Each structure stands twice: as structure tokens, then as C-alpha cells.
Amino acid sequence: MGRGSGTFERLLDKATSQLLLETDWESILQICDLIRQGDTQAKYAVNSIKKKVNDKNPHVALYALEVMESVVKNCGQTVHDEVANKQTMEELKELLKRQVEVNVRNKILYLIQAWAHAFRNEPKYKVVQDTYQIMKVEGHVFPEFKESDAMFAAERAPDWVDAEECHRCRVQFGVVTRKHHCRACGQIFCGKCSSKYSTIPKFGIEKEVRVCEPCYEQLNKKAEGKAASTTELPPEYLTSPLSQQSQLPPKRDETALQEEEELQLALALSQSEAEEKERMRQKSTYTAHPKSEPAPLASSAPPAGSLYSSPVNSSAPLAEDIDPELARYLNRNYWEKKQEEARKSPTPSAPVPLTEPAAQPGEGHTAPNSMVEAPLPETDSQPITSCSGPFSEQYQNGESEESHEQFLKALQNAVSTFVNRMKSNHMRGRSITNDSAVLSLFQSINSTHPQLLELLNRLDERRLYYEGLQDKLAQIRDARGALSALREEHREKLRRAAEEAERQRQIQLAQKLEIMRQKKQEYLEVQRQLAIQRLQEQEKERQMRLEQQKQTVQMRAQMPAFPLPYAQLQAMPTAGGVLYQPSGPTSFPGTFSPAGSVEGSPMHGVYMSQPAPATGPYPSMPGTTADPSMVSAYMYPAGAPGAQAAPQAQAGPTTNPAYSSYQPTPTPGYQNVASQAPQSLPAISQPPQTSNIGYMGSQPMSMGYQPYNMQNLMTTLPGQDASLPAQQPYITGQQPMYQQMAPSTGPPQQQPPVAQPPPTQGPPAQGNETQLISFD
């Protein structure tokens, strides 16, 4: 597939469209040019055309066959190789068999016959000739053949020649020196010898391609020769005897001159009436629009006819009788008048450049000065008028355009008449030198030639002017596009800046939040430290209170008014060397602390306020405290055991069966107590059956030695002095405490005299006494 495949497909679709009413030769020629100049490969082009030939629509197939015919005739050997082969011939035969459209069948037969005649001398294309003969034998009727239809004289670009050195300067090719081929001659050249670019019309190459210097000079010389010959007379006229004759027009008689004058007068009158009507119309328009008042001054410029004035126009009235349509442009008086106006205001025949109006005010001419000094209105039509010169002012109304159209129409009629007269003379064999009509037509056409050139120049100038405007519009469009791009870029920058600012703000907020979190953590840590410090201080205060309580307890224990048996027992060991640990909490003298009581409770401090008895009936002997082997105990009055037992039973808790069943008798004496103890108190060796009232009853100590009995107790206790009163027996639990807590507010009980037991009392009395005694 070539580089121009897209263009080729578009042109092929256009040339084979089913909507066409006739063959589109322009598209077909462009297809041929694409194949000839190498933009589209021949194989690809022929295959695409074959697809169109096999289309179901007969119109598309017929136009595709037209394209194939033109391609074969104009594109040379590369296309011949693709068409004149067995495959293509078989496809055409199959298409002919299944095609029912008469025009398509006739076109296929016509192409096969023409190709067979054209390639009859080419051995490699013999398959076309064989196909033609076979189809004739099969009975196909071929259309009438013309030899001119088989003229394949198309020139194609030569094949490229490969060599190792330049064809002109003989420089060897290498890494630095590259190979280049000339598209005109096909030879190989170096870069210096093939640096020119040119078009090659004979090969159908309409774009500039690389050619060598000799081919470039040859092609340009031909182009210059053709350009120079266009300005000269045609060769038919130069070779004819007419060019040898005098070019002076023949004299006319008086009648022709009079008719010419009358015709010119009528034309002048009609022209003046038209100008007057136009002037009135413009005046009414200017009064309605006062801003455009300077415009009537510009109307004084020479009209369209004066712009085409030329010294050659003196011969124009001679052709008046030949073509009446040229009378308006060949009016002698009219043109003389316009020439005088042109001499008064020297307007050049060429278009006024865009820079000249700036220098015109200094010349003192009224018409150009009025155009330059006139203020520019707000509309866009006036700047074009002031810049384009008088020619553009003629297009402000429709008169000039109409006159130009009439001029062109008249000139076309004259040329067609001239050509027909020449052809008629040629067909009849008459000489054009003897035909006065041909001579007069030639003179009239020659006289209008300068006007035609002037009109072409003006049109070309306007075309350049509008192309310049289009370029400016394109520049403005590009500038607007660039401005839009800059604005978009600016908006993008602003958006990015806003996003960056937002991102920075988010980062700052995140940093602030992190700082606040750290401060919060520090604050919580400080609060926790403060709480821990307060707890430590409270713990220290509690420890200090405990220390103070311990000191207070120790001080109370050391005070003589509050003897504590537990402290004494801890300080003074027994005679046997055994130190007994107290099993219950420290009890203050004169207090009652049941189990589960708390310091400061009413039960704890109710007895603290009760004063203990100041003096006992039996003061302690001084000798007893000095003896270390003697156990110091509370000295209970021996004569009043019954009086103290009753308050103890009432004050103590009633849950203890021992206290509830114990009813002391008023008769004092150890014997009675000993005799009643086994009935009311449990044995010492047995565990108490009461609830947790005292520490001794709730926590019985498991001693590692043998329990006390009467024999061990008698051996353990020191000798008792006969002068001391008998100690009150200890009852299990907190009975000594209850005995100490006896109310002292009541009337003093009369203690009966204690009967001393006889010294020869038996052991049973001692056993009963032993059960009533307990050591703290």
C-alpha cells in the first residue's frame, strides 16, 4: 500500500459512485497521476479497481471499468503487468458470464478487444490475445473496433539505475556520500549533483521531486519557453498570409459612420440616465445615514470604463457594426471623456498599493484626498474601500459588476464568432485574408485585450487582498488559539496552586493535630503522674496513721493504768522458757472489740469512755512484778465472782452457748465454779461451738506440745503466795475482757468474803480450777 492510499480510495469511491450521471474524468485523471508518480502502488490500485468491477450495482461496475481503461492507457508497464495476466482475464470472463447488464457486457468485450490489439506485439502479454481468440470462438460478439482506441502512448518514469559512483561527478558512494536517484532520467547521483527539485508533467508528477541539474535545466527551459509563447500571437496567425498584410482597418462609408454616431448617442443617453438614477439612490441612502457623507466624494473617481482606458482603444469603434454588444465599450465619446478625466486625476492602470493612500494627500488631488481624509465608519466595508483604491469603490453598487459581466459575455461571443468563422473558412478552403469579417473580429478582440488584462490584474489584486485578509484571519485565529491555550495554562496553574495550597493546609492541619495529640498525651501523662503522686501521698499518710496508731498502742501498753496481758505475755516468758504468741488482736484495757469491728465504730469506742475502776481491793504486791518467773495477771477480786458474772452474761453476745447457759451462783468460791464449769463450758481441748465472737474462740491454736492438764499446770505455775488472793479463773473466749468491762457506774457490789480452800484439798478441786484458768 502506497503513501496516498487514503487519497486513492477517496478518489476511487468518487469516480465509481452510483450517484454519477456521467463519467468523472477529473477524479480518474487524479487516480492516474497518483499511480504514475508512485504515491499508490499499481498492484494495490488494480486490486481496488477489481473490487469495484465485481460490485453488484451495474453503475458502479461500469464506472470501475472506465477507471481501469484509463489506468491501463495512462499508467504504463506497471499497470499492464497487473492487468494483462491470466488471473485478471479469467475474472473478466467470469464477470461476463454472470453479468446481465448490456452496457457492462459490451464494456468488458470492448476492453478485451482493445487490449488484445494493443498488446499483440508483446510476448509476455500473449494471454490477452489468447483470451480474445477463445471468446471469439465461443461466439461472443465484439463491438466495432477503432484503432485509435488502442493507442497506449503514455510515458512513465524510468526505472532507477543502481551503481557505486555518481553518474555525473564519479564520486564513490559511502557512509557520508549517499545515493540519490533522479526521477526524470532514473540515473544515480550524489547529493550535490541532485539538489534540485522540480515537477515532471510528462510523467504525471505534479509535485516537486528530486531531479539532477541537467534535467532541472531542461524542464525549466521548457517552462520558460511556454510562458514566453503565451504572450505572443498564435502560430496559425503567424504562418498565415494575414500577418503579412497591413493591419490598418478598412475605410467605411458615411452611412456606417452616421449609424455609429447615433448608436453612441443612444448609449450615452442611457448611460447618463442610469448614472442619474444611481446618484439619486445614493443621495437618499446618504441622507438616511449621515455618517457615510464622505462616500459621495469618492464617487467622483473615474468609473469602471476609465480604468480600462488605453491608447489602443482608438480602433474600438471600427468593430461596432460587427458586434453590437461591444458598442457600449467601444463608444468613442464616452471613452474620450473618461480619458480626459483620467488625465485630470492620474490614476494608474495597475492597482493602487496599500501604502499609497498615505502619500496621496500631499498631491493636492480632490478625489484621492477625500478618500484618505474621510473618517472611518464603524462598519467593516469602508476600510476595504479606502485600501483597495478606486477599483473597489466601483463595487459599492452593482453597476460595475454587471458591466464586467456584460463585457466578458460580449468578449466571449466575439471569440466564439471568430473561432467559428475561422473553422468555416478552413472547412471551405477559403483563405482568411480575403474574409473581412475575420479581420474585423480580430481587430475588435485585439482592442479588448488590454481591458481584459486590466480586469484580470484587478481581479488578481483583489484575490491577493482577500488572501491577505484570510491570512490575517488565520493569524487572528492562531492568536486566539494561543491565547486560549495560555488562559487554559493559567487556569491550570491556578488550579495546581490551589491544590498545592490545600495540600499544604491539610499538612499543617495534620501537623497541628499531631501536636495537639502529643500535648493531650502529655497532659494525660501529667494527670496520671499527679494521680499516682496523690495515691502515694495518701498511702504515706495511711502508713503514718498506722505508725501513729502503733505508737499509740505501744504507749498505752507501757502505761501502768492500762495493763495489757498480751503485751506482758510477749515480754515475759514463762518459767518453762516457752513464749506464747497471742492469737488475737491487741485489746486495749477497758475496751470491747468484737469480731468484725472497725476502729472508730460505736462498738469499738463505747467502752473507751467508761472509766476503769481506779483501785482494786487488792493492790499488786511489789514483789510480784520483780519475779521474772511469775506470770503477772489481772488481779480479780475473789470475793465477788457472782456479782461480775451476771453483767458479763448480759453484755456479751448471746450467740455463744457457753455464755448463754452460764448462770453463776451468788455463792462465791472456786469449788462451786469448778463444779458448774463442766456443765456450762466446753473442755479446753475441744474446739468451741460458738460463733466468731473472740479471737480465742474463732482461731484455736494448734499447739505442737501436749495440752495442759492439772499435773502439767501445777508443775508449770510458780509457787503462789498465801497472802495473795486467788485469781479468778479464765473462761474460754473473751471472758476476762467482759470481766474488765463490768460496769462501774452502778452501786458497788458488796463482795462476800472469799473462803480460803483448805490446803489439803484433793486433786479434783485443782482439776476444776485448771479448766477455769487461761493464759493470754
Curated annotation (Swiss-Prot):
Modifications made to the protein after synthesis: Phosphorylated on Tyr-334. This phosphorylation occurs in response to EGF. A minor site of phosphorylation on Tyr-329 is detected. Protein phosphorylation may also be triggered in response to IL-2, GM-CSF and HGF. Ubiquitinated by ITCH.
Chain ranges of the VHS domain: 15-143
Tissue/organ expression: Ubiquitously expressed.
Biased composition (Pro residues): 745-762
Subcellular location: Cytoplasm; Early endosome membrane; Endosome, Multivesicular body membrane
Modified residues annotated as N6-acetyllysine in this record: 207
Modified residues (Phosphotyrosine): 216, 308, 329, 334
Zinc fingers classed as FYVE-type: ranges: 160-220
Subunit structure: Component of the ESCRT-0 complex composed of STAM or STAM2 and HGS. Part of a complex at least composed of HSG, STAM2 (or probably STAM) and EPS15. Interacts with STAM. Interacts with STAM2. Interacts with EPS15; the interaction is direct, calcium-dependent and inhibited by SNAP25. Identified in a complex with STAM and LITAF. Found in a complex with STAM and E3 ligase ITCH and DTX3L. Interacts with E3 ligase DTX3L; the interaction brings together STAM and HSG, promotes their recruitment to early endosomes and decreases STAM and HGS ubiquitination by ITCH.
Protein name (database record): Hepatocyte growth factor-regulated tyrosine kinase substrate
